Swiss-Prot record:
Record-annotated membrane-spanning stretches: 590-610
Subcellular location: Membrane
Domain of life the protein comes from: Eukaryota
Residues spanning the signal sequence: 1-40
UniProt-annotated glycosylation sites, renumbered to this chain: N363
Protein name: Uncharacterized protein KIAA2013 homolog
Membrane-related topology note: Single-pass type I membrane protein
Gene Ontology terms: cellular component: membrane
Keyword annotations of the record: Glycoprotein, Membrane, Signal, Transmembrane, Transmembrane helix
Transmembrane keyword on record: yes
Cystine connections: none
Organism listed in the record: Bos taurus (Bovine)
Topological domain ranges for the Cytoplasmic compartment: 611-634
Extracellular side: 41-589
Amino acid sequence: MWLQQRLKGLPGLLSSSWARRLLCLLGLLVLLLWFAGSGARRAAGGLQLLPWPHGEPGAAEPSACLEAATHAWRSLRERGEAVLLGPGVPSLVANGFLALDVVANRLWVTPGEREPAVAPDFVPFVQLRPLSALPEAGESVLLLREGLLRRVRCLQLGTSGPGPAAAGPGPASASGLLTGSGRDCVLLQEDFLAHRGRPHVYLQRIQLNNPTERVAALQTVGPTAGPAPRAFTSTLEKVGDHQFLLYSGRSPPVPTGLVHLVVVAAKKLVDRLQVAPRTQLDETVLWVVHVSGPLNPQVLKSKAAKELKVLQDLARKEMLELLEMPAAELLQDHQRLWAQLFSPGVEMKKITDAHTPSGLTVNLTLYYMLSCSPAPLLSPDLSHRERDQMESTLNYEDHCFSGHATMHAENLWPGRLSSVQQILQLWDLWRLTLQKRGCKGLVRAGAPGILQGMVLSFGGLQFTENHLQFQADPDVLHNSYALHGIRYKNDHINLAVLADAEGKPYLHVSVESRGQLVKIYACEAGCLDEPVELTSAPQGHTFSVMVTQPITPLLYISTDLTHLQDLRHTLHLKAILAHDEHMAQQDPGLPFLFWFSVASLITLFHLFLFKLIYNEYCGPGAKPFFRNKEDPSV
């Protein structure tokens, strides 16, 4: 009865304005508390996704297993050293001779420097499949500093149904990946790479971690575990304790009608991989690829046997050499060479416009171009004489890079690449651009020279006979970036364009000594001040940005002090301005569109005013200018 009376009085209570306000305030407070609580629950749930020490998965759902296995990628991505695969990021691993698309499972071979890449009808990698469709989670990443693609898959264990097999551990059955609970996961990690120091070699490393109490099994699908590809014949080679498959065939004709003979040696792999409970499997599959020069199909029959014999002997010899090496040593050798090759580069610090490529775009472009470039300097078969010749070619300054900077050339630094074929076309464009801009010597040196030319071109650096000059456009220094590892004599120079607290740009230069100490000097535009000796001090050296009239380079670097001192007398400048003074002169004030809009509004206003006056005195029913005394209507 009391409750009924209170409910009858509720409409009257709510009719009060202060009561409605209080009710709305309480409702808003409840909503805020609910959202805060759900956010805290989500945060707590996110922390619980990593239940395994050191990133090792245990019994959990595939998504939680994947989160733990890929947790270390986050810091690599923040440093620009790793890129997740996705739209606009082709899954390419290459070494200048071999190019492999991991996702599409395709192989390209470049027979010669000026020959187009050929695509043999050969499936390059082994595919690992569970024995039945099971829930799984996976992710792939390009590790730019290691030169490989890593794919991680977390596979949830299948159930084998009722019966003795489901009661305890046992071999995998055809009904699932494993026997046992459906909440157990195994971690599969695969590394794909084309070896940087051995141009004919690529490999796939398979690591399967089974932390459960059951046996895990995966079926292998690929040329090393099944029948030979359609265009190839295969033979099993046995030498001592080693055995491998030798495939022989030919590539499809290139547009000119010529064909190439192809021989592939591949390590033999079993049809099914099984891992005992609480153990790990580490298996490395090796391939060696050799191709012939272009052959006319009409003379192929007469030359095929002899050419194939030569290619088979080369592939057999290299495969036996690889099988004698520990697989871990082969992988570490590749990572060491790739890290050495990728030490120079471009670091984007702050971008203030839409036309400058992002750090991700720059790093991906450098990775793809390095992958497509041969590196003869890294070959173990190179003689000392040949190595010295290539080193001298790489250290020869030439006149690279002539012309304006390529920083804003969107066709050279594309924000999106759709396929491996597009990457190969981009590499041809980069090579042609560098050759036409005075970098022929660097291009001949292979991947280290290509990278040096790309770094020089990005910032507008150019070597001359006596110095290295930084000739960036003063109007585009609002972006902050750093160029690392520029070869000069026997040292490496790092040059950065930075901004102070007021937004004014300045230059920061540091030197990394490599071997014999050589004095290096630098002076800013005009060289009016005495050149400064660059040292390997950690803090480096800073230079203000000065702009000359007419425009000359912003910075000069040389080992010849007298040359820099003489420059001030040979430049013949009209004026030297600070960067902000130059920009003030370049700034035309308000944009043209603003003034055009103001002028249009003023014109329209006067036209409207003229129309009013015209309608008042000249339009229909307009009043006369003078009164007529005889007109009674006036």
